[in-house]
Amino acid sequence: MNFGLFFLNFQPEGMTSEMVLDNMVDTVALVDKDDYHFKRVLVSEHHFSKNGIIGEPLTAISFLLGLTKRIEIGSLNQVITTHHPVRIGEQTGLLDQMSYGRFVLGLSDCVNDFEMDFFKRKRSSQQQQFEACYEILNEALTTNYCQADDDFFNFPRISVNPHCISEVKQYILASSMGVVEWAARKGLPLTYRWSDSLAEKEKYYQRYLAVAKENNIDVSNIDHQFPLLVNINENRRIARDEVREYIQSYVSEAYPTDPNIELRVEELIEQHAVGKVDEYYDSTMHAVKVTGSKNLLLSFESMKNKDDVTKLINMFNQKIKDNLIK
């Protein structure tokens, strides 16, 4: 099991954007130190609201890669459906070269209809657009060149510069059953959405296994990623209240057709690492097992006391270290 961090960068009431970004930078600088054992940090993409203030994660990632020396830095959900794949390929090659292979590319279809509309993409062909973007991008990353002649792109063979110097690790956000099935056919690892229920994540995993088997894909070395919100407090009520306050607006925005947002929020609180220190381990290990995950990504952003965040990161780091020694 590998451990990492992910950042949603929500801007709650009472916090400035500078405060949100400084918290991310300070935390990343901490876990990059030699005596910390977190493998990677991933940054989320989100547009047009304070439920995630980084609309261009690769820009933030370039800063964090320059800030750090050891840890991998990457995107949690770089949306390719609303971006030009050649541009993402160029950015990826640059980040791969300048970080000496520490960049991780987490890709996503668009999960919000309002983003598809704003960027003038047709919802009716969304899956096809996503797949077309990926094929161009992957060709650029694996061969250093790409070309296209399909319903969405048409351009001659070009060199995508600078060329990647390593095999950039890719993950696909489990944004829909169609995307999960497509990823399974290609043997690409998933990153589950933190805001999906465990039942939804498990359903995706079981479908992934079935499709992979149908296509003779060996899943033994596929390392899915499980994102976990963490808020540990001696006062269980404080932990739950902080998480509820932190995620309520995003969940309402992300699941507009859900008839009972309050129930979904409470279910998420139960399924993430929220509460006292002895309340999260068994449920977390169960969730990791039933989703086939080999990477556990942690977010401490809902915690308001930053000294407590540091203490909790140190606690997790010691547990990781102890396990490595064993």
From Swiss-Prot:
One of its GO terms (biological process) is bioluminescence. The keyword Kinase does not apply. It comes from the Bacteria. InterPro entries: Alkanal_monooxygenase, Bact_Lucif_Oxidored, Bacterial_luciferase_CS, Luciferase-like_dom, Luciferase-like_sf, Luciferase_bac/NFP. It is an enzyme of class 1 (oxidoreductase). Gene3D superfamilies: Luciferase-like domain. One of its GO terms (cellular component) is cytosol. GO terms for molecular function: alkanal monooxygenase (FMN-linked) activity. Keywords: Flavoprotein, FMN, Luminescence, Monooxygenase, Oxidoreductase, Photoprotein. Its EC number is 1.14.14.3. The keyword Flavoprotein applies. It catalyses: a long-chain fatty aldehyde + FMNH2 + O2 = a long-chain fatty acid + hnu + FMN + H2O + 2 H(+). CDD domains: Alkanal_monooxygenase. Belongs to the bacterial luciferase oxidoreductase family. PANTHER family: BLR5498 PROTEIN, LUCIFERASE-LIKE MONOOXYGENASE. Heterodimer of an alpha and a beta chain. Light-emitting reaction in luminous bacteria. The specific role of the beta subunit is unknown, but it is absolutely required for bioluminescence activity. This is Alkanal monooxygenase beta chain.
